[in-house]
Amino acid sequence: MFIDKNLNWNHHITNLSKQLSRANGVLSKLRYNASLEFCLQVYYAIFYSHLTYGCNLWGFTSEENISKLEVLQNKCVRIMTFAPFNSSTNEIFIELGLGKVRDLISLNQLKSVYDFTQNCYLLTLWIFSLTVAMLIQHLVNWIVL
């Protein structure tokens, strides 16, 4: 992950775009000899994994950066399905059960918030149980004395 001194993600998105372009290249060569199911496995292995890594942090980047990633993801989906370069990808995403870049970012951010709240809840329970245990210990000591 790359972030500059101005706290922008341009360098990271540029690097990520290169990785995603390479993944598109692999899929474009693979699609002629592999099934769609296999191409989807490769998509998850080399495209999706790069796309979603750290998106909780860089997901708040500029609209321009998100658009770059959307273009690459749309190209990837068209490659896998042999769709024309100018065709709409909305139906393809639905048909394949894939999430779009913006949806993946939102989903991962929501998961992080949920995990954080669950951890806070567990921490609260742990503190409460310690407090109860300490109160019981004090009561036992008071009764014994």
Identify the function of each model-found stretch.
Residues 1-145:
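Hydrophobic/basic alpha-helical segments
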